[in-house]
Curated annotation (Swiss-Prot):
Family, similarity comment: Belongs to the universal ribosomal protein uS3 family.
Disulfide bond residue pairs: none
Name of the molecule in the record: Small ribosomal subunit protein uS3
Taxonomic source organism: Brucella suis (strain ATCC 23445 / NCTC 10510)
Record GO cellular component, one term: cytosolic small ribosomal subunit
Domain KH type-2: from-to ranges: 39-107
Keywords assigned: Ribonucleoprotein, Ribosomal protein, RNA-binding, rRNA-binding
Molecular function per GO: mRNA binding; rRNA binding; structural constituent of ribosome
Protein backbone atom coordinates (compact mmCIF):
# COMPACT_ATOMS: atom_id res chain seq x y z
CA UNK A 1 0.00 0.00 0.00
CA UNK A 2 2.77 2.42 0.93
CA UNK A 3 4.38 1.83 -2.48
CA UNK A 4 1.27 2.99 -4.36
CA UNK A 5 -0.37 5.75 -2.33
CA UNK A 6 0.71 9.39 -2.05
CA UNK A 7 2.97 9.37 1.08
CA UNK A 8 1.67 12.76 2.25
CA UNK A 9 -1.98 11.66 2.05
CA UNK A 10 -1.15 8.44 3.92
CA UNK A 11 0.32 10.42 6.84
CA UNK A 12 -2.34 13.15 7.15
CA UNK A 13 -3.42 13.46 10.76
CA UNK A 14 -0.40 11.44 11.96
CA UNK A 15 2.65 13.61 11.35
CA UNK A 16 1.42 15.75 8.41
CA UNK A 17 -1.39 18.27 8.14
CA UNK A 18 -3.53 19.63 5.32
CA UNK A 19 -2.48 22.51 3.04
CA UNK A 20 -6.06 23.87 3.10
CA UNK A 21 -7.07 24.50 6.72
CA UNK A 22 -10.66 25.64 7.03
CA UNK A 23 -14.20 24.48 7.72
CA UNK A 24 -17.31 25.42 5.72
CA UNK A 25 -21.04 24.83 5.55
CA UNK A 26 -22.27 22.26 3.04
CA UNK A 27 -23.45 24.98 0.64
CA UNK A 28 -20.14 26.87 0.66
CA UNK A 29 -17.69 23.97 0.61
CA UNK A 30 -17.59 23.51 -3.18
CA UNK A 31 -17.17 27.25 -3.85
CA UNK A 32 -14.29 27.57 -1.38
CA UNK A 33 -12.60 24.45 -2.74
CA UNK A 34 -12.70 25.90 -6.28
CA UNK A 35 -11.29 29.16 -4.89
CA UNK A 36 -8.36 27.26 -3.35
CA UNK A 37 -7.60 25.57 -6.69
CA UNK A 38 -7.75 28.91 -8.55
CA UNK A 39 -5.51 30.62 -5.95
CA UNK A 40 -2.87 27.88 -6.25
CA UNK A 41 -3.00 27.89 -10.06
CA UNK A 42 -2.76 31.70 -10.17
CA UNK A 43 0.19 31.91 -7.76
CA UNK A 44 2.04 29.01 -9.41
CA UNK A 45 1.68 30.66 -12.84
CA UNK A 46 2.43 34.19 -11.60
CA UNK A 47 5.49 33.17 -9.55
CA UNK A 48 7.19 30.61 -11.81
CA UNK A 49 10.69 31.84 -10.91
CA UNK A 50 10.08 31.99 -7.13
CA UNK A 51 10.71 28.26 -6.45
CA UNK A 52 7.41 27.66 -4.61
CA UNK A 53 7.40 24.56 -2.41
CA UNK A 54 3.78 24.71 -1.19
CA UNK A 55 0.88 27.12 -0.62
CA UNK A 56 -1.09 26.92 2.64
CA UNK A 57 -4.58 28.49 2.72
CA UNK A 58 -6.40 29.26 5.99
CA UNK A 59 -9.81 30.89 6.33
CA UNK A 60 -10.58 32.52 9.69
CA UNK A 61 -14.02 34.20 9.98
CA UNK A 62 -14.67 36.14 6.71
CA UNK A 63 -10.93 36.38 6.02
CA UNK A 64 -8.35 34.49 3.97
CA UNK A 65 -4.73 33.90 4.97
CA UNK A 66 -2.36 32.61 2.26
CA UNK A 67 1.15 31.40 3.20
CA UNK A 68 3.66 30.78 0.41
CA UNK A 69 6.69 28.58 1.16
CA UNK A 70 9.38 29.70 -1.27
CA UNK A 71 13.14 29.31 -1.73
CA UNK A 72 13.33 32.80 -3.31
CA UNK A 73 11.14 35.12 -1.21
CA UNK A 74 12.79 38.25 -2.65
CA UNK A 75 11.17 37.61 -6.05
CA UNK A 76 7.70 37.52 -4.44
CA UNK A 77 8.19 40.55 -2.19
CA UNK A 78 9.71 42.79 -4.87
CA UNK A 79 11.28 46.21 -4.40
CA UNK A 80 10.05 47.76 -1.11
CA UNK A 81 7.22 45.19 -0.97
CA UNK A 82 5.48 46.51 -4.11
CA UNK A 83 4.97 43.11 -5.78
CA UNK A 84 3.56 41.39 -2.70
CA UNK A 85 1.00 44.19 -2.28
CA UNK A 86 -0.17 43.74 -5.91
CA UNK A 87 -0.55 39.99 -5.32
CA UNK A 88 -2.50 40.60 -2.11
CA UNK A 89 -4.96 42.91 -3.92
CA UNK A 90 -5.49 40.37 -6.73
CA UNK A 91 -6.13 37.60 -4.19
CA UNK A 92 -8.62 39.82 -2.32
CA UNK A 93 -10.53 40.34 -5.60
CA UNK A 94 -10.54 36.58 -6.28
CA UNK A 95 -11.82 35.63 -2.82
CA UNK A 96 -14.04 38.68 -2.05
CA UNK A 97 -12.51 38.60 1.45
CA UNK A 98 -9.88 40.46 3.44
CA UNK A 99 -6.76 38.54 2.36
CA UNK A 100 -3.35 38.52 4.03
CA UNK A 101 -0.26 37.12 2.30
CA UNK A 102 2.68 35.64 4.24
CA UNK A 103 6.00 34.40 2.88
CA UNK A 104 8.02 31.60 4.54
CA UNK A 105 11.56 31.03 3.28
CA UNK A 106 12.63 27.46 2.47
CA UNK A 107 16.25 27.54 3.63
CA UNK A 108 17.21 24.08 2.34
CA UNK A 109 15.64 23.66 -1.13
CA UNK A 110 18.00 20.72 -1.76
CA UNK A 111 15.96 18.52 0.64
CA UNK A 112 12.50 19.77 -0.38
CA UNK A 113 10.89 17.13 -2.63
CA UNK A 114 8.77 19.56 -4.69
CA UNK A 115 11.69 21.89 -5.36
CA UNK A 116 13.98 18.96 -6.27
CA UNK A 117 11.37 17.72 -8.78
CA UNK A 118 10.99 21.22 -10.27
CA UNK A 119 14.78 21.59 -10.61
CA UNK A 120 15.14 18.23 -12.40
CA UNK A 121 12.21 19.07 -14.72
CA UNK A 122 13.83 22.40 -15.64
CA UNK A 123 17.11 20.61 -16.41
CA UNK A 124 15.32 18.07 -18.63
CA UNK A 125 13.72 20.96 -20.55
CA UNK A 126 17.22 22.39 -21.09
CA UNK A 127 18.32 18.99 -22.51
CA UNK A 128 20.58 18.08 -19.57
CA UNK A 129 21.15 14.29 -19.40
CA UNK A 130 18.49 12.86 -17.07
CA UNK A 131 20.92 10.54 -15.22
CA UNK A 132 23.25 13.44 -14.47
CA UNK A 133 20.35 15.60 -13.22
CA UNK A 134 19.08 12.78 -10.97
CA UNK A 135 22.49 11.93 -9.48
CA UNK A 136 23.32 15.58 -8.83
CA UNK A 137 20.01 16.05 -6.96
CA UNK A 138 20.56 12.86 -4.91
CA UNK A 139 24.10 13.88 -3.90
CA UNK A 140 22.98 17.39 -2.87
CA UNK A 141 20.10 16.04 -0.75
CA UNK A 142 22.24 13.45 1.06
CA UNK A 143 24.98 16.01 1.70
CA UNK A 144 22.49 18.42 3.33
CA UNK A 145 20.98 15.97 5.82
CA UNK A 146 18.42 13.75 4.05
CA UNK A 147 18.46 10.16 5.34
CA UNK A 148 17.25 8.79 2.01
CA UNK A 149 15.96 9.90 -1.38
CA UNK A 150 14.34 8.26 -4.40
CA UNK A 151 13.79 9.90 -7.80
CA UNK A 152 11.67 8.51 -10.67
CA UNK A 153 11.82 9.94 -14.19
CA UNK A 154 9.41 8.62 -16.83
CA UNK A 155 8.65 9.41 -20.47
CA UNK A 156 10.71 9.57 -23.66
CA UNK A 157 13.96 10.02 -21.76
CA UNK A 158 16.82 11.25 -23.93
CA UNK A 159 14.48 11.36 -26.94
CA UNK A 160 14.04 7.56 -27.01
CA UNK A 161 11.38 6.11 -29.34
CA UNK A 162 9.80 4.07 -26.52
CA UNK A 163 8.85 5.73 -23.23
CA UNK A 164 10.29 4.16 -20.09
CA UNK A 165 10.85 4.80 -16.39
CA UNK A 166 14.26 5.21 -14.74
CA UNK A 167 14.82 5.57 -11.00
CA UNK A 168 17.69 6.24 -8.64
CA UNK A 169 17.77 5.77 -4.87
CA UNK A 170 20.23 6.37 -2.07
CA UNK A 171 19.76 5.73 1.67
CA UNK A 172 16.46 4.54 3.22
CA UNK A 173 12.98 5.50 2.01
CA UNK A 174 10.56 3.47 4.24
CA UNK A 175 7.20 4.18 2.57
CA UNK A 176 5.22 1.77 4.82
CA UNK A 177 6.47 3.29 8.09
CA UNK A 178 3.86 5.84 9.21
CA UNK A 179 6.20 7.56 11.68
CA UNK A 180 8.69 8.25 8.85
CA UNK A 181 8.84 11.92 7.83
CA UNK A 182 8.66 11.52 4.04
CA UNK A 183 8.32 14.51 1.73
CA UNK A 184 6.90 13.89 -1.75
CA UNK A 185 6.81 16.10 -4.82
CA UNK A 186 6.11 15.88 -8.55
CA UNK A 187 6.81 17.98 -11.63
CA UNK A 188 6.40 17.79 -15.41
CA UNK A 189 9.08 18.59 -17.99
CA UNK A 190 7.66 19.75 -21.33
CA UNK A 191 10.39 18.58 -23.73
CA UNK A 192 10.51 18.54 -27.55
CA UNK A 193 9.69 14.79 -27.45
CA UNK A 194 6.70 15.10 -25.12
CA UNK A 195 6.05 15.39 -21.39
CA UNK A 196 8.39 13.66 -18.92
CA UNK A 197 7.19 13.11 -15.35
CA UNK A 198 9.40 13.49 -12.28
CA UNK A 199 8.57 12.08 -8.82
CA UNK A 200 10.71 12.60 -5.72
CA UNK A 201 10.54 11.02 -2.24
CA UNK A 202 12.79 12.41 0.53
CA UNK A 203 13.14 10.64 3.91
CA UNK A 204 14.06 13.16 6.62
CA UNK A 205 14.04 10.90 9.70
CA UNK A 206 11.36 9.61 12.06
CA UNK A 207 8.76 11.56 14.06
CA UNK A 208 7.81 9.61 17.18
CA UNK A 209 5.12 11.91 18.62
CA UNK A 210 1.56 11.76 17.23
CA UNK A 211 1.28 15.38 16.04
CA UNK A 212 -0.09 16.46 12.62
CA UNK A 213 1.96 19.69 12.78
CA UNK A 214 5.20 17.85 13.68
CA UNK A 215 6.64 17.74 10.15
CA UNK A 216 6.04 21.46 9.55
CA UNK A 217 7.39 22.44 12.98
CA UNK A 218 10.43 20.24 12.49
CA UNK A 219 11.25 21.91 9.15
CA UNK A 220 11.10 25.39 10.73
CA UNK A 221 13.22 24.31 13.73
CA UNK A 222 15.77 22.70 11.39
CA UNK A 223 16.03 25.94 9.39
CA UNK A 224 16.52 27.98 12.58
CA UNK A 225 19.23 25.60 13.86
CA UNK A 226 20.99 25.74 10.49
CA UNK A 227 20.98 29.55 10.41
CA UNK A 228 22.20 29.82 14.04
CA UNK A 229 25.04 27.34 13.40
CA UNK A 230 26.04 29.35 10.31
CA UNK A 231 26.13 32.52 12.43
CA UNK A 232 28.32 30.74 15.00
CA UNK A 233 30.76 29.71 12.25
CA UNK A 234 30.90 33.28 10.94
CA UNK A 235 31.57 34.66 14.45
CA UNK A 236 34.32 32.07 15.01
Amino acid sequence: MGQKINPIGLRLGINRTWDSRWYANTGEYGKLLHEDVKIREFLTEELKQAAISKIVIERPHKKCRVTIHSARPGIIIGKKGADIEKLRKKLSEMTNADTSLNIVEVRKPEVDATLIAQTIAQQLERRVAFRRAMKRAVQSAMRLGAEGIRINCSGRLGGAEIARMEWYREGRVPLHTLRADIDYGTAEAKTAYGICGVKVWVFKGEILEHDPMASERRAVEGDNQGSSSNRRRENA
